[in-house]
Amino acid sequence: MAHYRIIDTASWPRRDHFTFYRQFANPSFNLCVPIAAQRLYECAKDRRVSFFQLALYALLRAANGVPQLRQRVWNDEVIEYDSLAVMTPVMTVGEGFRQVWCDNAPEFTAFSA
C-alpha cells in the first residue's frame, strides 16, 4: 500500500510553477544524461551481481532522495509519496520482453531478491 502526504499548495513554494504546468496536456519530463558507470560496473563484477540490477537500484535510490520526484497530482491534489518503486522491461529467454515491478528496498540484496 502506498503511503503519501498531501501537500498544502496554498503555502507551497512551488505553487506558481504547479499552476503554470498543470495547464499542459501532458505535464511530464524526460531526462537523458551521460553517466560515468565504470566504477559501478566494476563493483557489480567484483560482487558477481547483475550490473543492470545494481544500476537500477542506484537510480531508484537517487530518485527517492529527491522529494520533488516523489510528487504527483492525484484527484486535483499534490501528493508526495514516502517511497517510489520502478517498473522496467526485462528481456526474456525468447527475446521477448516482460515488465517487472521492483519495490524500493534499503539494501541491494533485498532489492535484487
Language-model-detected regions and their locations in the chain:
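Short polybasic amphipathic segments
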Residues: 87-90
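Structural preference for long, well-ordered alpha-helical segments in enzyme cores
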Residues: 56-62
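Helical lid/core segments from catalytic subdomains that handle acyl or acyl-like groups
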Residues: 92-113
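Basic, often amphipathic N-terminal segments
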Residues: 12-17
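Gly/Ser/Thr-rich phosphate-binding loops and adjoining beta-strand/alpha-helix segments
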Residues: 2-10, 21-54, 65, 70-85
